[in-house]
């Protein structure tokens, strides 16, 4: 499996280290990095975005498609690259979360890792609980959006329902 899935709660120790879920470590290691890459989110919310090298390379490709002298590219690069951190796993599968990212997400003693396919999020548990309630309320309205992707998933000449 090459995607981040599931929800895991882990403690931050007194040195700012947190154990990355084994399944998340396996995804990043399979992509060639004995660590994870973390950066501030582009959407509203107090959490940290995380990924392996595959998604990080996709971010680089997206930025490369933008005008290299545009203000938007500069701002995106500042957040996605300048504020990012490559965090290597220690022998116990832990990473040291940088202070700037911990403060941004309001992380103190516990975090929730939430899989999101090619990337994942690291939340303060209370903030994630509130987000999850709101997501459960709103996601039924997104059904048509998800259904609109079905055409590209059906095999040629393929029937479907």
From Swiss-Prot:
Highest rank taxon of the organism: Bacteria
Keyword Mitochondrion: no
GO biological process: negative regulation of DNA-templated transcription initiation
A Gene Ontology cellular-component term: nucleoid
Localization terms from the record: Cytoplasm, Nucleoid
GO molecular function: DNA-binding transcription factor activity; transcription cis-regulatory region binding
InterPro entries hit by this protein: MraZ, MraZ_C, MraZ_dom, MraZ_N, MraZ_sf, SpoVT-AbrB_dom, SpoVT-AbrB_sf
Alphabetically ordered keywords of this record: Cytoplasm, DNA-binding, Repeat, Transcription, Transcription regulation
Domain SpoVT-AbrB: from-to ranges: 7-55, 84-127
Pfam families, per database record: MraZ
Subunit structure: Forms oligomers.
Database matches in HAMAP family: MraZ
Family to which the UniProt record says this protein belongs: Belongs to the MraZ family.
Protein name as annotated: Transcriptional regulator MraZ
Gene name of the record: mraZ
